[in-house]
């Protein structure tokens, strides 16, 4: 692990966690639970608390069980980041996004025994997506970054193998 990569890890974590927590602070201090502020015909701010993980999975787990699970995942992700080759920059960036999102949601879980969610996508009377937050978005974008990186490596390897035939 180089000093430069450690710097970018810490910078990425600081940015993701601060952005997530700043928005959640604003939501919790300006909106009552259960209130909605329509922004566009398809998106609203809708203040809720989620006692589970993504899409309310594991909501039957105990509060401390979810905290322990989240910490375990964060520790594993730090190990994964440390052991991912430096040339896999997109994967390493994705792992940082996932860790930052997990830490942001962990802070909520410790403070409120639930995660503050507030983004609602919907088509009036037709479709409503699960309510989520910026930390969830970071986690999703991080996973997509890793998948894209792995897919590009697979394509590159496949082309190399095809040329060697």
Curated annotation (Swiss-Prot):
GO terms for molecular function: aspartic-type endopeptidase activity. It is found in: Cell inner membrane. Keywords: Aspartyl protease, Cell inner membrane, Cell membrane, Hydrolase, Membrane, Protease, Transmembrane, Transmembrane helix. It comes from the Bacteria. InterPro entries: Peptidase_A8 (IPR001872). The keyword Membrane applies. One of its GO terms (cellular component) is plasma membrane. Its main location: membrane. It catalyses: Release of signal peptides from bacterial membrane prolipoproteins. Hydrolyzes -Xaa-Yaa-Zaa-|-(S,diacylglyceryl)Cys-, in which Xaa is hydrophobic (preferably Leu), and Yaa (Ala or Ser) and Zaa (Gly or Ala) have small, neutral side chains. The chain crosses the membrane at residues 7-27, 28-48, 61-81, 87-107, 128-148. PROSITE patterns: SPASE_II (PS00855). Pathway: Protein modification; lipoprotein biosynthesis (signal peptide cleavage). The active site is at 117, 136. GO terms for biological process: proteolysis. It is a multi-pass membrane protein. Its EC number is 3.4.23.36. Coiled coil: none annotated. Pfam families: Peptidase_A8. HAMAP family: LspA (MF_00161). Belongs to the peptidase A8 family. NCBIfam families: lspA (TIGR00077). This protein specifically catalyzes the removal of signal peptides from prolipoproteins. This is Lipoprotein signal peptidase. It comes from Bartonella bacilliformis (strain ATCC 35685 / KC583 / Herrer 020/F12,63).
């Amino acid at each position: 692990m180089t000093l430069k990569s450690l710097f970018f890890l810490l910078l990425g974590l600081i940015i993701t966690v601060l952005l997530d927590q700043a928005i959640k602070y604003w939501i919790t201090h300006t909106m009552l639970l259960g209130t909605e502020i329509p922004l566009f015909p398809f998106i609203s701010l809708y203040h809720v608390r989620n006692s589970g993980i993504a899409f309310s999975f594991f909501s039957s787990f105990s509060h401390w069980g979810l905290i322990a699970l989240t910490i375990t995942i964060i520790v594993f992700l730090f190990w994964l980041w440390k052991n991912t080759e430096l040339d896999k920059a997109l994967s390493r960036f994705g792992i940082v996004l996932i860790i930052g999102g997990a830490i942001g949601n962990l802070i909520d879980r410790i403070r409120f025994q639930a995660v503050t969610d507030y983004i609602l996508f919907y088509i009036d009377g037709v479709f409503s997506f699960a309510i989520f937050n910026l930390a969830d978005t970071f986690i999703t974008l991080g996973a997509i970054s890793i998948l894209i990186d792995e897919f590009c490596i697979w394509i590159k390897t496949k082309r190399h193998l095809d040329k060697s035939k």
